[in-house]
Every structure is written in structure tokens, then in C-alpha cells.
């Protein structure tokens, strides 16, 4: 069996990726989120497939087909809520995974990091289109507001929006194509994940000290497989508790009202995991400026490796950078809160200050802190 594991063309790939993979001996639980994201992706594809068997992508029947899934299909409500809350877990793990990368300097593995950012964009696009499918009030108005932002693009904006809509408003054509894209994107994400892993295994994992660990490696199995199983059990405990006790905790009550183009909800807002970007979008009075800020709020991650000025890779021994990092985390939590509030005083000014702080920390303060820490090391 050992020989087969090491010689069989297919098993050899699995062996080199998950069994005999040399891993640093000191990676902490912050390195668990990669495997958790993989588990979330598999869960989303499986539950999504079963939902697609009963869902109809038509404006007249979409809402009632979701109701049918919850009421008439055997354990349909479990599948539906696992899928909806699984998305929340997915983004929770994503944000922690990206945060880990920022803190420990994993972004210096350029290819792995950039594909990770593309994965983040693809996951956000998938989640947005999935939110439109139940065809509730927030689905319809969310789709209208977000797609309409593309009209801010000079010259081609309006044509682009109507092309995406498949008409002059969000309607049947929009829902059908969103369903098609929502179905195919997770498989594209899976392919990107394999490329992400391919590049990661070219360099090997980073570690909390941010130093080369070639002299002290241990096999991935059994050490990190067991460690990952603990993470999976913890995640499934949280997810199942959410699904079974409070499935609508993270959803919007407006989405239990069928979509009505003649009635605008008082507060149009996306799911919680988009609120920070939505707050940045709303903080700029100009439409095109807001759209650019929205895109840059994620795209800025691609510039982080080029803004790294410190001689140390990780923030483990860099207290000034640590302070800035945790201020950034607090700022993102503030932006998430602001994104869910109405556009009125004092929320407008708080959102604007938090948005400016977000970009200032990443573009200006972090590189300055790295430079200062280098200077203090000499001193």
C-alpha cells in the first residue's frame, strides 16, 4: 500500500499534497482555515446541487420554489439553511484566512496571494448572485442597486448594465443568467483553489516566526490532519447550532417578502459579509468614486506585498505593526456596523472616517511602521 501511495499517478498527487507534505513544525491554529475553507466549498457545492434540483430560475416561481424546498422537500429546510449559513461560515473563514496572511506576511508568496485575492473576488461574486436567487425584496433591490453601479463607468456604463440585466430592468433574464453563473462559479473556484495549492506547495507554508523552516519539517499526516479535524468539528458545531437554533439570525427579514419592483424597502443592504465594502461605497458622495473605492477595498490586497518595508516577514516581533493591524481589524468591524445603518447623521461621518482610516493604514501607516521598526532595530 505504501508503494502504491507513492507510485500510483493519482495517489501520488494526493500523497504529496496531504500525506507526506513537509510542513513547518510550529504552525498554529491560524493555519487551519485553509482546510476549513475547502470543507466549506465542498459543503456549498453539495447543498447547492440538491437545492438546484428543486429550484426554478423564473421570476414567477422562484420565491415559491424556495418555499416549496423548505416546506415540502424532505429535510429541504436543513439543506437550504446549511447553504445560506454555510456561506456566512465560508466568509468568516475567508476573512480570518486573509487576516492571518496579513499578520504573518504570507502575502510575500506572490502567486499564492494573488490567486487568493482572485478567489476572494470570485467568492464574493458567487455569494452576491446566490443572494438574488430566492427573489425576495432584498434579492431584487440588492441586484438592482449593485448592478446599477456599473452605470458609473464612463461612456459604456448604461449599455453594460442593460446587457447584464438582459433588458431595461432586473427581470426574468437577469435571474436566469444569475442562476447559471451561480451554478458554474463554484467549480471555477475549485479549479482556482487547486492552482492556489499548486503555488503554495512550490514554496511550502509560511510559519508564525516568518523564517525559513526547511531545517525543521514534519509530515502533514498525521500531525496536521488531526489538527484540521479538530477545526472541522468546531466549525460544524457552530454551523449546525446556527442552522438548528437560529437559521435566520444572519439573514434579512425583507427577503421573506416576494420581490416587488413597485415597493422599495426602507434600507437596502447586502448580507453581513459585504457590509464593510458597502459602507466604503456609500462613504463617497460621487457614484464613480464610490465604485472605485468599493473595488479598491479588496483589490488593495494585491498591493500589500509591494508595500512591505520591514526586514522581518511576520508581525510576531513588530509591536507597532501589531497595533496598526488590530486597529485595522477594529476599523473593519466598525465599517461592517456602519454598512447596516441608515444613511444619516452620525453614521455618514463615522463611515467616511472609517473608510479613510482603512486605506490610510494599509497604504501609508503600515509601510511607515515597517520602516520605523527597521530603524529601531539598528538603534
UniProtKB/Swiss-Prot annotation:
Protein keywords: Electron transport, Heme, Iron, Membrane, Metal-binding, Mitochondrion, Mitochondrion inner membrane, Respiratory chain, Transmembrane, Transmembrane helix, Transport, Ubiquinone
Co-factor binding comment: Binds 2 heme b groups non-covalently.
Gene3D superfamilies (alphabetical): Cytochrome Bc1 Complex, Chain C (1.20.810.10)
Binding site for a ubiquinone: 201
Binding residues annotated for heme b b562, in chain numbering: 83, 182
PROSITE patterns in UniProt: CYTB_CTER, CYTB_NTER
CDD domains assigned to the protein according to its UniProt record, in alphabetical order: cytochrome_b_C, Cytochrome_b_N
BP GO terms, sorted: mitochondrial electron transport, ubiquinol to cytochrome c
One term of GO molecular function: metal ion binding
GO CC terms in record: mitochondrial inner membrane; respiratory chain complex III
Chain ranges passing through the membrane: 33-53, 77-98, 113-133, 178-198, 226-246, 288-308, 320-340, 347-367
Compartment list: Mitochondrion inner membrane
Function: Component of the ubiquinol-cytochrome c reductase complex (complex III or cytochrome b-c1 complex) that is part of the mitochondrial respiratory chain. The b-c1 complex mediates electron transfer from ubiquinol to cytochrome c. Contributes to the generation of a proton gradient across the mitochondrial membrane that is then used for ATP synthesis.
Family the UniProt entry places it in: Belongs to the cytochrome b family.
Record's subunit section: The cytochrome bc1 complex contains 11 subunits: 3 respiratory subunits (MT-CYB, CYC1 and UQCRFS1), 2 core proteins (UQCRC1 and UQCRC2) and 6 low-molecular weight proteins (UQCRH/QCR6, UQCRB/QCR7, UQCRQ/QCR8, UQCR10/QCR9, UQCR11/QCR10 and a cleavage product of UQCRFS1). This cytochrome bc1 complex then forms a dimer.
Note: Heme 1 (or BL or b562) is low-potential and absorbs at about 562 nm, and heme 2 (or BH or b566) is high-potential and absorbs at about 566 nm.
The protein's name in its UniProt record: Cytochrome b
Species in which this protein is naturally found: Tupaia glis
Amino acid at each position: 500500500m505504501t508503494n502504491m501511495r507513492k507510485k500510483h499517478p493519482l495517489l501520488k498527487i494526493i500523497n504529496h499534497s496531504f500525506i507526506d507534505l513537509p510542513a513547518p513544525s510550529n504552525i498554529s491554529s491560524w493555519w487551519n482555515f485553509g482546510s476549513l475553507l475547502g470543507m466549506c466549498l465542498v459543503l456549498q457545492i453539495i447543498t447547492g446541487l440538491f437545492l438546484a434540483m428543486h429550484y426554478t430560475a423564473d421570476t414567477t416561481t422562484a420565491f415559491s420554489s424556495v418555499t416549496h424546498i423548505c416546506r415540502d422537500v424532505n429535510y429541504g429546510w436543513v439543506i437550504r439553511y446549511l447553504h445560506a449559513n454555510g456561506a456566512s461560515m465560508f466568509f468568516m473563514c475567508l476573512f480570518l484566512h486573509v487576516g492571518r496572511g496579513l499578520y504573518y506576511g504570507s502575502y510575500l508568496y506572490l502567486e499564492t496571494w494573488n490567486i487568493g485575492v482572485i478567489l476572494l473576488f470570485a467568492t464574493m461574486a458567487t455569494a452576491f448572485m446566490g443572494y438574488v436567487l430566492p427573489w425576495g425584496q432584498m434579492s431584487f433591490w440588492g441586484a438592482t442597486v449593485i448592478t446599477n453601479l456599473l452605470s458609473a463607468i464612463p461612456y459604456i456604463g448604461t449599455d453594460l448594465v442593460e446587457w447584464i440585466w438582459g433588458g431595461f430592468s432586473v427581470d426574468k433574464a437577469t435571474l436566469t443568467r444569475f442562476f447559471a453563473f451561480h451554478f458554474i462559479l463554484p467549480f471555477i473556484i475549485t479549479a482556482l483553489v487547486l492552482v492556489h495549492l499548486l503555488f503554495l506547495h512550490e514554496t511550502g507554508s509560511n510559519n508564525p516566526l516568518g523564517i525559513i523552516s526547511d531545517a525543521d519539517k514534519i509530515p502533514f499526516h498525521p500531525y496536521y490532519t488531526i489538527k484540521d479535524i479538530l477545526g472541522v468539528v468546531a466549525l460544524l458545531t457552530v454551523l449546525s447550532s446556527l442552522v438548528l437554533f437560529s437559521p435566520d439570525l444572519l439573514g434579512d427579514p425583507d427577503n421573506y417578502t416576494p420581490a416587488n419592483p413597485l415597493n422599495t424597502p426602507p434600507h437596502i443592504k447586502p448580507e453581513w459579509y459585504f457590509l464593510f465594502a458597502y459602507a466604503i461605497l456609500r462613504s463617497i458622495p460621487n457614484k464613480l468614486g464610490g465604485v472605485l473605492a468599493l473595488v479598491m477595498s479588496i483589490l488593495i490586497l494585491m498591493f500589500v506585498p509591494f508595500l512591505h518595508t520591514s526586514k522581518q516577514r511576520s508581525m510576531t516581533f513588530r509591536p507597532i505593526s501589531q497595533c496598526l493591524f488590530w486597529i485595522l481589524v477594529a476599523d473593519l468591524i466598525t465599517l461592517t456596523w456602519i454598512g447596516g445603518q441608515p444613511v444619516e447623521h452620525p453614521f455618514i461621518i463615522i463611515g467616511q472616517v472609517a473608510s479613510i482610516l482603512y486605506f490610510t493604514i494599509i497604504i501609508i501607516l503600515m509601510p511607515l511602521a515597517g520602516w520605523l521598526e527597521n530603524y529601531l532595530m539598528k538603534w
